[in-house]
A protein has these predicted regions:
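Glycine- and aromatic-enriched mobile tails/lids
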Residues: 1-169
């Protein structure tokens, strides 16, 4: 009920022809690609490498390794192909689009984890086992600039009912 009310009352940004054109181009590029890379194989490699190098318990060394793996996977993603060229109910196209988004999110996650030199919540750096509120009690906003570099901005954490304290088990 709350989601429906929010959707009804929300102020949406206008969808421009430029945005539609970018989306159409991405779809057509995938449908017309004659590359040899298969979406399922790339997705499986992404899943396994993220589990091996960027799951809850991480080190800078493993995260750096994953950065390189992601570069390779993103390069290979440019050479994917799909068999279904249709416009209706094309689940293969949806999976190809989703893989592209997964690669982008993985890149932001790995760079953010590498940048954050502490452990906090589900982000456990074995090479930085302590929480560092002085330097890292903030939200990380990752974004890409035109040259492909991942950059960061930060937003303060608003404390209230729950103050940070050491975990004791």
């Amino acid at each position: 009920i709350h989601a429906a009310r929010f959707a009804r009352d929300a102020d949406y940004h206008e969808l421009t022809e430029e945005h539609l054109g970018e989306s159409r181009e991405r779809i057509e590029r995938i449908k017309n690609s004659t590359g040899k890379e298969k979406v399922a194989a790339l997705r499986a490699e992404l899943q396994q490498s993220m589990m091996d190098n960027a799951s809850v318990f991480r080190t800078g060394e493993l995260l750096k390794k994953q950065v390189e793996i992601l570069k390779e996977l993103m390069d290979r993603y440019k050479r994917i192909s799909i068999d279904d060229k249709g416009d209706a109910y094309n689940t293969e196209l949806v999976e190809a689009l989703e893989l592209g988004y997964l690669l982008e999110v993985s890149e932001a996650l790995v760079h953010s984890a590498l940048n954050r030199t502490e452990s906090r919540g589900a982000h456990a750096r074995e090479d930085y086992p302590e929480r560092d509120d002085e330097n890292w009690l903030k939200h990380t906003l990752a974004y890409k600039v035109e040259d492909g570099k991942v950059c960061f901005r930060y937003k303060p954490v608003v404390l209230g009912r729950f103050e940070p304290k050491p975990r004791t088990y």
